[in-house]
């Protein structure tokens, strides 16, 4: 992950810019200040991947976003936090990996290692699934035509 130590402010100030896409999505789905209220009540928690170490996430719905940039060890650490009564969703785009050269994507490794486990499924989206601006689908298709996904 990104280095947070050099950013100004307390930990919340440091991580909030990275969490903004999640706040945006919550605000799209929950009316008014409902998202803020649920976060304040700790019924919804948004935390950096590094904060998951040592935890067990029981009776929870857990989302790891942008997982293409998790290392293999980060992915293993995250997936092994699964507690009783919980579900996990891991999202990521294999075409947007920006880890340093030679560092494998934990998302790709998880696909390879876990695809035969019956209770784990992988779902893949195409440009037809884009819900952003219509041009985004065309942009994705142009990049795919130039360099097909692996």
Model-derived features: where do they sit?
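Conserved helicase motor core of SF1/SF2 NTP-dependent helicases
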Residues: 1-64, 68-150
């Amino acid at each position: 992950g990104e280095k947070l130590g050099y950013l100004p402010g307390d930990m919340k100030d440091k991580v909030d810019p990275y969490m903004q896409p999640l706040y945006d999505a919550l605000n799209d789905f929950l009316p008014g200040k409902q998202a803020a209220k649920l976060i304040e009540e700790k019924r919804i928690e948004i935390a950096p991947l590094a904060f998951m170490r040592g935890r067990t996430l029981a009776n929870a719905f857990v989302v790891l976003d942008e997982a293409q940039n998790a290392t293999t060890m980060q992915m293993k650490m995250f997936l092994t936090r699964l507690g009783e009564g919980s579900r996990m969703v891991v999202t990521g785009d294999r075409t947007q990996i920006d880890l340093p050269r030679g560092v494998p994507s934990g998302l790709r490794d998880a696909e390879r290692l876990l695809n035969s486990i019956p209770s784990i499924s992988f779902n893949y989206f195409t440009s037809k699934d884009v819900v952003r601006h219509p041009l985004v689908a065309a942009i994705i298709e142009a990049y795919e035509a130039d360099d097909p996904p692996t």
